[in-house]
Amino acid sequence: MKFEAVVRTEQGKGASRRLRHAGKFPAIVYGGTEAPVSIELIHFDVINQMDKPEFYEAIELVIDGATVKVKPQDVQRHAFKPKVEHMDFIRI
């Protein structure tokens, strides 16, 4: 499973809200020897794959051309809408 991601340039609550209104959501990739990286993902692409078991095993994220193997560590969902608010990924 592979997803395209873009490094986030803006941080904070306002920037995250603008992402969500644009059909994206913020995420972070951490672990290993590299520094944590804030990214943005397209909500529609991810939410359609989340009900598959292989989503929680290993994912390839293409972050600005570099491929990183990750595993979802934490998912924050909206209280009553079927939306993802934020995700944490750990490098494997």
Swiss-Prot record:
Keywords: Ribonucleoprotein, Ribosomal protein, RNA-binding, rRNA-binding. The keyword Disulfide bond does not apply. Pfam families: Ribosomal_L25p (PF01386). GO terms for molecular function: 5S rRNA binding; structural constituent of ribosome. GO terms for biological process: translation. One of its GO terms (cellular component) is cytosolic large ribosomal subunit. Transmembrane segments: none annotated. InterPro entries: Rbsml_bL25/Gln-tRNA_synth_N (IPR020056), Ribosomal_bL25/Gln-tRNA_synth (IPR011035), Ribosomal_bL25_short (IPR020055), Ribosomal_L25_dom (IPR029751), Ribosomal_uL5_bac-type (IPR020930). Part of the 50S ribosomal subunit; part of the 5S rRNA/L5/L18/L25 subcomplex. Contacts the 5S rRNA. Binds to the 5S rRNA independently of L5 and L18. NCBIfam families: PRK05943.1. This is one of the proteins that binds to the 5S RNA in the ribosome where it forms part of the central protuberance. Belongs to the bacterial ribosomal protein bL25 family. This is Large ribosomal subunit protein bL25. It comes from Aliivibrio salmonicida (strain LFI1238). The gene is rplY.
